[in-house]
Amino acid sequence: MSKLGYDIDEVDITVGTSYDATGEAMSAGSIDLGWLPGGTYALYSDDVDVILTATRNGLSNDSTNPADWNGEANATKKDGPQVTYYRSLIYATPSEYGKELAAKVNAGEKLTWEDLDKATWAVQKTSSSAGYIYPSMWLMANYDGKKISDLSNVMPIDSGYGTAFSYAAAESVDIIVCYADGRNDYEASWMLPTDQQDETGKQGMGRSDSIWNEMNVIGVTEGIYNDTVAISKESQYYTPEIVAALQDCFINIIGTDEGKAIFDVYSHTGYAKATDADYDGARAALQAVAE
């Protein structure tokens, strides 16, 4: 920011316990700037303004046919073109019933509502785009308006996708939902002994076959607009000039090798200036799920 004419003495950086917690803190004005998924931004957009949208490296697979994602031969790679959206995937776990669901999908059979309702689902908080909102919209589009809240056996998870994959590995649930392709991030830990950790610190899950064979995609959602960099409307610091400088600053930083390394934790590879209207679709998704 100093190169753009603004001297900032001190920045306090914290890690939110959840996306909702970050959104609530920004709404209250106790956080000035934060990174929020599109769905969380839409939920808090009365009190928060978007300034940037992330771009990411796309995946090698963007098929809407779930069977195309399954098996070692279809293992997803992070080598696609730059994209402004991602998808959520609905995965059948290696539980006995999860395997039944996967076998039907891989044979080209469409799952019925009864098939899905019999399963035990693990889902994220209701503000999570990939972990709740878009999977619920997928159900609505394919099963006569039914959604996650209509399912008989749903296990909400407050502690993130790692917990969902650990439940899957333990065969405690039959279906989990996650961003595409979450299997990349848990591939190394999936087959490690449970008393070991992978190089990123993820605990081993003790499975004996690869995650690509055991975690089968049974549903693919519509595209989800990428994460935001957003600012609190309650903050005392922002003027249009400072916002413009922040936008340029983040775009410049991520354009460097050092910046790319910093933002790799989010899988962000670039930023583009954004407006609130870009997330009208995310608001519509929230409304559809809430009704």
Spans of features found by a protein language model:
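Extracytoplasmic/secreted proteins, especially bacterial periplasmic and envelope-associated proteins
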Residues: 21, 25, 30, 39-43, ...
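Short, well-ordered beta-strand elements
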Residues: 1, 11-15, 118-122
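Beta->alpha turn/N-cap motifs
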Residues: 15-20, 29-42, 47, 52-57, ...
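Pocket-lining segment of extracytoplasmic ligand-binding domains
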Residues: 117-237
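Short helix-initiation/N-cap motifs at beta->coil->alpha
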Residues: 6-7, 11-24, 37, 147-166
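A conserved helix-loop-strand patch within extracytoplasmic ligand-binding domains
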Residues: 55-129
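Short, polar/charged alpha-helical segment
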Residues: 1-10, 137, 249, 257-262
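An extracytoplasmic/periplasmic, membrane-proximal ligand-sensing/linker region
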Residues: 142, 237-291
